[in-house]
Regions:
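Small-residue-enriched, tightly packed secondary-structure blocks
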Residues: 1-139
Length: 139
């Protein structure tokens, strides 16, 4: 995850997702996510720890690119999620998902203990390895 700060893009903070659900599903798929935190409150809320959402999901994927339509039970969309799926999958389900910080991955990448809020606010300097990603995102 990466955040836009007043001074440009932050360094990346590593995250993991997990969850469970119930419904009728068949097939297998791999999904890549881009998570957009739309405001400072969303960045701060995520930086403090994992967040849980409960939603209804109707999905279909076939071949190299699929589409997923998901609706979360949230009053305001402070977070947008874009996804790209590969595989063969169809299903309807009620799901819960958790997105959390991978503290050990952040430790390994930054060379020591660092908090997600320090990374995403730009307080922690981005390592040189993050430069290509930050350049690709633009100013």
């Amino acid at each position: 995850m990466i955040a836009r700060t007043p001074r440009g893009w932050s360094g990346p903070s590593f995250v993991a997702t997990g969850g469970g659900g119930w419904g009728l599903q068949a097939g297998a798929q791999v999904t890549d996510f881009v998570i957009v935190l739309n405001n400072d409150a969303a960045v701060q809320a995520f930086s403090r720890g994992g967040n849980m959402t409960i939603g209804v999901d109707l999905s279909a994927a076939a071949g190299p690119v699929g589409r997923t339509a998901a609706g979360a039970v949230m009053p305001i969309a402070a977070v947008y999620t874009y996804s790209r799926s590969k595989g063969l999958f169809v299903g309807v389900s009620l799901e819960g998902a958790v997105i959390g910080t991978q503290r050990q991955s952040n430790f390994n990448y930054y060379g020591g203990p660092v908090r997600a809020d320090s990374i995403l606010s730009g307080v922690t300097k981005a390592p040189p390895g993050a430069a290509p990603l930050r350049r690709a995102l633009g100013p």
